[in-house]
Swiss-Prot record:
The UniProt record lists the keyword Zinc: yes
Any Pfam family the entry gives: zf-C2H2
CDD domains to which the protein is assigned, alphabetical: SCAN
Domain SCAN box: 44-126
Region (Disordered): 162-199, 272-298, 414-433
SUPFAM superfamilies: beta-beta-alpha zinc fingers, Retrovirus capsid dimerization domain-like
Organism: Pongo pygmaeus
Chain segments annotated as transmembrane: none
Name of the molecule in the record: Zinc finger and SCAN domain-containing protein 4
Gene for this chain: ZSCAN4
Molecular function via GO: DNA-binding transcription factor activity, RNA polymerase II-specific; RNA polymerase II cis-regulatory region sequence-specific DNA binding; zinc ion binding
Localization, UniProt: Nucleus; Chromosome, Telomere
Zinc finger intervals, C2H2-type: 312-334, 340-362, 368-390, 396-418
Length: 433
């Protein structure tokens, strides 16, 4: 900010004329401009002074800036609020959105140099609103302000993708209520798979845009000239009057920020005759990884050329999984591998999400409170399970004996009694009552 203000002082002095300082600055440059042959005596003097006086040039520069700012802000006359108002106004004028500086200065003077009155009289006629950027990623698209950080744009669109992925995966299959599809899993959610952990409690940036199912490797950002959005069939960058391509960022360049997002709590498919696990995880985003990305934490689900879903079968049991990360997490249970260890109590877990849930217990925090009885819980899913006591809801139904349960842990405990007598025709997903 200091550099921007310095530029203003050198090129366009503000209302409090800094003639003396600018004159001093011009005089200091005069000898260097007037002498054209060789290195001037003044230049040699400045160079020697810089080399021999232990950063005296830096001190002189700081002192000069101090005099300029002191003369402009006049702290002996102005209060802190007035000084802040001057800085805010100057930054507003050099921020790039002000299109009529003369009008803004006139309104500033007419307001008595009072920021509150100035803001009341200020209209949008004197500024250029931020341009809109049309972003298309993984079949999702939305308009964002050009001032919005790219990281926030990716987070919004990734959440939008994840909000649609569970709905598409669950079409035509009975599923449990959405009360158990959140990131904050409780101690009762012991059967969730790891490797793809994410919060599914998200809000779509633009609910009018549907997922077109295109597996796009890159993030396409198209500049919009504050005009209407393009057709929903895709993003068109052929018309220079409506939009222009501003940037192309590959998904691989963003993998550091995206791979850190976690996925949880979406039902998974099982093989015929197997007991279902309604709280298995599912990837939040459909980012297409390159074939040589061996360090990916979750292999993206993809369809074949004929739309056939690829599946992964466990070699030790008949269970089948949609995603490789689910299979790997499941195989750790067969081997009883618990690589994720709590540093405080040394308890091991099959998946990182279970460890994160467990670590909340050590903090002693219980941020989730029941609205009916004021009882507090450390995890949101525990609160939801508790609330079912008040509502009487039992969303987990046994497909064999039609017995309903409030908690998934009780449901799974009951299902183990049927595990050895499961008929092949029984559906793999429990019905939610």
């Amino acid at each position: 900010m200091a550099l921007d203000l310095r530029t203003i002082f050198q090129c366009e002095p503000s209302e409090n004329n800094l003639g003396s300082e600018n004159s001093e600055f011009r005089q200091s440059q005069g000898p260097a401009v007037q002498r054209e042959e060789g290195i001037s005596e003044f230049s040699r003097m400045v160079l020697n002074s810089f080399q021999d006086s232990n950063n005296s040039y830096a001190r002189q520069e700081l002192q000069r800036l101090y005099r300029i700012f002191h003369s402009w802000l006049q702290p002996e006359k102005h209060s802190k609020d007035e000084i802040i108002s001057l800085l805010v106004l100057e930054q507003f004028m050099i921020g790039g959105h002000c299109n009529d500086k003369a009008s803004v200065k006139e309104k500033w003077k007419s307001s008595g140099k009072n920021l509150e009155r100035f803001m009341e009289d200020l209209t949008d006629d004197s500024i250029n609103p931020p341009a809109l950027v049309h972003v298309h990623m993984q079949g999702q698209e939305a308009l964002f302000s050009e001032d919005m950080p790219l990281k926030d744009v990716i987070v919004h669109l990734t959440k939008q993708v994840s909000a649609q992925t569970p709905r598409e995966a669950n079409m035509g299959t009975p599923s449990q209520t959405s009360q158990d599809t959140s990131l904050e899993t409780g101690e009762g959610c012991e059967d969730e798979q790891d490797g793809c952990n994410s919060s599914l409690k998200t809000t779509q940036v633009n609910e009018n845009i549907t997922n077109q199912g295109n597996q796009i490797v890159s993030l396409i950002i198209i500049q919009e000239e504050n005009g209407p959005r393009s057709e929903e069939g895709g993003v068109s960058s052929d018309n220079p009057n409506n939009s222009k391509r501003a940037e192309l960022v590959t998904a691989r360049s963003q993998e550091g920020s995206i791979n850190g997002i976690t996925f949880q709590g979406v039902p998974m498919e099982m093989g015929a005759g197997c007991i279902s696990q309604p709280e298995q995880s599912s990837p939040e985003s459909a980012l297409t990884h390159q074939s040589n990305e061996g360090n990916s934490t979750c292999e993206v689900h993809q369809k074949g050329s004929h739309g056939v879903r690829k599946s992964y079968k466990c070699e030790e049991c008949p269970k089948v999984f949609k995603y490789l990360c689910h299979l790997l997490a499941h195989q750790r249970r067969h081997r009883n591998e618990r690589p994720f260890v709590c540093p405080e109590c040394q308890k091991g877990f099959f998946q990182i999400s279970d460890l994160r849930v467990h670590q909340i217990i050590h903090t002693g925090k219980k941020p989730f409170t029941c609205s009916m009885c004021e009882k507090s819980f450390s995890h949101k899913t525990n609160l939801r399970s508790h609330e079912r006591i008040h509502t009487g809801e039992k969303p987990y139904t046994c497909p064999f004996c039609k017995t309903s349960y409030r908690q998934s842990s009780t449901y799974h405990r009951h299902m183990r009694t049927h595990e050895k007598i499961t008929p092949p025709s029984v559906p793999s997903t429990p019905e939610a009552s």
